[in-house]
């Protein structure tokens, strides 16, 4: 608990613009600032910040309040946690009162999981730097990827030795509870009730929340060391603090660059993100090999409207991920696609090129998603009329889910040219699809109202 005597000083110091702009891109409008609401699926900016009143409010979903309320809602913190966050941000000291036992338990559970994760992160980092295996196996792997020391430090990379329970033993010795080691997924229990490390024999990539807390880990197996291990990457299981669909690898390190460049690059893996950072491109996040969820897209959308998806030169992955891109369009993002040269992924390409060369390559080679999809499917369909009809249906579907009418119109004209069909045809098809979508939405809303 936090004593209230420091509150006026704290609220006075916590400038609402300053606090909110850590998480939302704000643009000046008159005496206020406005941005996309971080609390609901906001297509047009409805989140207002008033520096004069020290308040923020979304005029669509109604959420808002002062700086403390904003942090509580945004970072999922309790009132005392939010006060501590702001006190730390502004360097104000606050005295604490004793918490009630219920408060302690509820706050304790989440906080304990984060504390255990922090311990594990420090432990893995220490092993990487100071343990003989860490240096000869873990560090050797990162060196082979060309990672510099400052980058290894920045992303808090680590190593877990091949002894199956070294982390578990160290944690228990330091007084961390077995229960929390299992709940965070750092360890699991064998049938004979022994604790095993989930990440033994792997290099470690911590996953950070938007505000920089370690919420999970990814571990990559090293070829020579663990023959017979089938799974290349192991990730933390879902937990009370980790919901995979709400986290994006690299977002904490990328958010400022995304705002500055007003664009986000999407790649697939941890090493893609890290290599691009090292080559000087920081506005990049990874979907970690799964399709993007609307929660992840919304997180990016707070910072920018523009997304470029970077693909390896092989075609197999592209067809699979095209479905995910439709979701980006639906959330109102401008999506471009850039194919890297054959045989390169973002990681290998970034190692061969500096930031200027990489950016120049993207500028010259990125295409609008709809144009990209049209050309890709046209190649597939060839002259076959049935396949071409299917292709038109497919593109019409992508265009019909775009929220802004002007953007839809531009795409319709472009597609009509590429496909040698009349605008009118596509206009009426898109209109039909949109009517159908509106009906389905109304039905869904009605069902929810009844239930």
Predicted features by range, described:
Residues 2-104, 162, 417:
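N-terminal structured subdomain of primase-like DNA metabolism proteins
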Residues 7, 37, 58, 71, ...:
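Terminal peptide-recognition signature
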Residues 10-13, 27-30, 103-113, 131-136, ...:
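Conserved phosphate/pyrophosphate-binding and hydrolysis machinery centered on Walker-type P-loop NTPases
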Residues 29, 105-120, 161-303, 307, ...:
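Phosphate-handling DNA/RNA-contact segment within nucleic-acid enzymes
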Residues 54-55, 88-92, 100, 139-144, ...:
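Short, conserved phosphate-binding/catalytic loop or strand-edge motifs used
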Residues 73-91, 202-222, 348-352, 356-360, ...:
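Structured, non-catalytic alpha/beta "coupling" segments that mediate domain-domain communication
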Residues 81-134:
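Conserved active-site segments centered on acidic
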Residues 209-210, 255-263, 291-307, 312-451:
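A charged alpha-helical hairpin associated with nucleic-acid processing machineries
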């Amino acid at each position: 608990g936090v004593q209230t005597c420091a509150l006026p000083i704290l609220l006075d110091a916590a400038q609402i613009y300053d606090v909110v702009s850590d998480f939302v891109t704000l643009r000046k409008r008159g005496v206020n600032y406005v941005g996309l609401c971080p609390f609901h699926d906001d297509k047009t900016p409805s989140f207002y910040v008033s520096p004069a009143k020290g308040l923020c409010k979304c005029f669509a979903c109604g959420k808002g309040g002062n700086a403390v309320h904003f942090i509580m809602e945004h970072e999922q913190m309790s009132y005392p946690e939010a006060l501590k966050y702001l006190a730390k941000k502004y360097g104000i000291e606050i005295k604490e009162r004793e918490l009630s036992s219920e408060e302690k338990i509820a706050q304790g559970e989440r906080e304990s999981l984060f504390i255990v994760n922090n311990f594990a992160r420090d432990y893995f980092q220490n092993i990487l730097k100071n343990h003989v295996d860490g240096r000869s196996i873990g560090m050797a792997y990162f060196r082979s990827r060309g990672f510099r020391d400052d980058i290894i430090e920045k992303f808090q990379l680590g190593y877990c030795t091949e002894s199956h329970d070294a982390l578990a033993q160290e944690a228990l010795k330091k007084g961390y509870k077995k229960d929390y080691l299992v709940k965070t997924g750092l360890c699991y229990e064998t049938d004979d009730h022994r604790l095993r490390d989930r990440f033994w024999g792997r290099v470690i990539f911590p996953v950070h929340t938007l505000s920089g807390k370690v919420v999970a880990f990814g571990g990559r197996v090293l070829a020579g060391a663990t023959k017979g291990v089938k799974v290349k990457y192991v990730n933390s299981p879902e937990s009370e603090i980790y919901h995979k669909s709400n986290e994006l690898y690299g977002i904490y390190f990328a958010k400022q660059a995304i705002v500055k460049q007003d664009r986000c690059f999407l790649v697939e893996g941890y090493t893609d993100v890290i290599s691009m950072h090292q080559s000087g491109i920081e506005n990049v996040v990874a979907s970690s090999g799964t399709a993007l969820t609307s929660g992840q897209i919304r997180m990016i959308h707070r910072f920018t409207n523009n997304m470029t998806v970077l693909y390896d030169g092989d075609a197999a992955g592209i067809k699979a991920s095209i479905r995910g891109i439709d979701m980006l369009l639906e959330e109102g993002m401008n999506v471009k696609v850039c194919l890297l040269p054959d045989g390169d992924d973002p990681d290998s390409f970034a190692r061969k090129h500096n930031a200027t060369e990489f950016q120049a390559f993207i500028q010259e080679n990125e295409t609008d998603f709809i144009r990209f999809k049209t050309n890709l499917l046209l190649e597939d369909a060839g002259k076959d009329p049935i396949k071409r009809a299917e292709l038109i249906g497919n593109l019409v579907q992508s265009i019909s889910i775009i929220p802004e009418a002007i953007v839809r119109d531009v795409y319709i004209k472009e597609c009509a040219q590429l496909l040698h069909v009349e605008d009118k045809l596509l206009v009426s098809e898109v209109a039909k699809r949109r009517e159908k979508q509106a009906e389905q939405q109304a039905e869904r809303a009605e069902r929810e109202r009844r239930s």
